[in-house]
Amino acid sequence: VPVRFLSDVQRNALAGWPEEVNAEALERFFTLGVADLAEVRRRHGDANRVGWALQLCALRVLGFLPDDVRSAPSDAVRSVAHQLDIDPTALGAYGQRAQTRQDHAGQVRDYLGFRLARPEDLDGVRAWLTDQALVSDRPAALFRLACAQMYELRLVRPGVTAVEQQLVGVAREAARREVYRRLQPLLTAERLVVLDGLLVLDPDLGMTPARWLARRPVAASPKAMLGEVDKLVFLRDLGVEGWDVSVLPAKRATSL
């Protein structure tokens, strides 16, 4: 099972509306154009019109539709309602029938040219994301890339957990296996002995060489600099600089 990397706070934030919207974002993402206004006015009733318009704005800016349209930031609600010449409180009566919300969601998707992702769509995004993970497998960055790619493809973003585990988690694991596959020819019997030795406790260091190499200096001092030089000398003595890792993207090779 792919590892979860998002905290509950992050997951909740990514699943819904932002808590607030600044003036620049209001103008950029919550301004309805002439065609938008004409489409909104095809709906009957103030509640349906303001609710539909907010779903339109949500998909346009977020790439998905929050479960509760009525939880939109108050500034956004007021701005959209003002453009429609509707009392903002009308939103409170929106979507009392689940079918209405679902119908409107489909209409908004069609209007903006979005569609729900099919399994084959997600397979394509996952393959693309695996290529990105070969360069850098930072999960938060991959999450953003996955969302941006789906937006570019006009695919409605699935739920946060689906993106986190089924896309990012699986892509990271696939990239990790691909890194190992590409590096396999480097792992000669002699080098395996060297690598295994890094996991053996060194009495002089008081820890394993692997842990010593991974430790970062806590301060910029002459002693710390000498310690880093000692690590470089240690690795040079092992012949690491002669290991050809050009089969990996430069950024990924640097991070090893």
Residue ranges of predicted features:
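Long amphipathic alpha-helical coiled-coil/heptad-repeat bundle
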Residues: 2-256
